[in-house]
């Protein structure tokens, strides 16, 4: 510990030469043969430009993936319930026929891997059932909009065309009053139809004359006569073709085929 010297922070930031001289004078009394060098720290900062990279982000992603893999491994574990321990390797049919004891000893043995059970729950699939905006909102190009403007009719155009039609109608009426085409005054037309309907109602409601009343009575009498004659003819036809049998109520005698079995047969010659 005699080789080291306690130096204050103020002495460290002084000039190197003055500090070296003081240190040499003090150390010469203790150890003249040894020479100790003192390193002065730099007082200026060095500015270094470093290009930024995404290594930090890559590290974060790698850490996250490693963490996820670790969690997955923790959720999966081996379950030895259905494992059967050690199973002999399958042999060829020729070796099975030999059945030597040496082959049974030398057969390699393989271990069955244990069943893995995972506690992970299946993630629910998020199905987006929304229709696209094109289904609700139509988007037209500039050419289509121009076509719509050309094919559409404004209010001013309708008024302008209607005035032209009225002018044409007046001109036709003035020049050819007898050839008006389909131009109809609805008020006059409806009034004429109403008059015709009223005339028809009056004709229906008025009382018929004496001759008409007599003709109606005669027609009713003759229709009655025709009906009575038709009924009589129908009755006569029924009596003619639908006669009742006379033996309807006679009692039937049961037939006995052995009633005349003892009688002698009769021939034509007898």
UniProtKB/Swiss-Prot annotation:
InterPro entries named among the record's database cross-references: DUF2011
Residue ranges, compositional bias (Polar residues): 90-102
Span list, region Disordered: 1-76, 90-111, 204-270
Any matching Pfam family: DUF2011
Bias kind Basic and acidic residues: ranges: 1-13, 49-73, 218-235
Basic residues: bias regions: 204-216, 236-253
Name used for this protein in its record: Uncharacterized protein YNL050C
């Amino acid at each position: 510990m005699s080789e080291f010297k306690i130096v204050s922070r103020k002495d460290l930031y002084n000039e190197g030469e003055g500090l070296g001289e003081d240190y040499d004078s003090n150390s010469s009394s203790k150890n003249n043969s040894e020479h100790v060098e003192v390193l002065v720290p730099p007082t200026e900062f060095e500015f270094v430009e470093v290009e930024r990279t995404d290594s930090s982000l890559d590290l974060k992603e790698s850490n996250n993936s490693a963490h996820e893999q670790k969690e997955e491994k923790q959720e999966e574990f081996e379950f030895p319930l259905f494992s059967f321990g050690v199973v002999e390797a399958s042999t060829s049919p020729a070796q099975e026929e030999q059945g030597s004891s040496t082959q049974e000893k030398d057969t390699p043995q393989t271990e069955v891997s244990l069943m893995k059970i995972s506690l992970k729950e299946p993630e629910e699939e998020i199905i987006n059932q929304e229709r696209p905006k094109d289904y609700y909102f139509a988007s037209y190009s500039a050419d289509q909009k121009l076509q719509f403007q050309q094919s559409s009719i404004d209010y001013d155009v309708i008024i302008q065309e209607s005035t032209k039609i009225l002018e044409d109608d007046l001109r036709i009426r003035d020049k050819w009053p007898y050839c008006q085409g389909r131009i109809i005054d609805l008020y006059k037309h409806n009034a004429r139809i109403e008059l015709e309907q009223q005339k028809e109602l009056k004709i229906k409601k008025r009382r018929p004359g004496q001759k008409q009343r007599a003709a109606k009575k005669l027609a009713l009498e003759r229709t009655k006569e025709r009906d009575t004659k038709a009924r009589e003819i129908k009755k006569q036809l029924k009596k003619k073709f639908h006669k009742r049998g006379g033996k309807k109520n006679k009692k039937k005698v049961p037939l006995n085929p052995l009633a005349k079995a003892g009688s002698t047969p009769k021939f034509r010659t007898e």
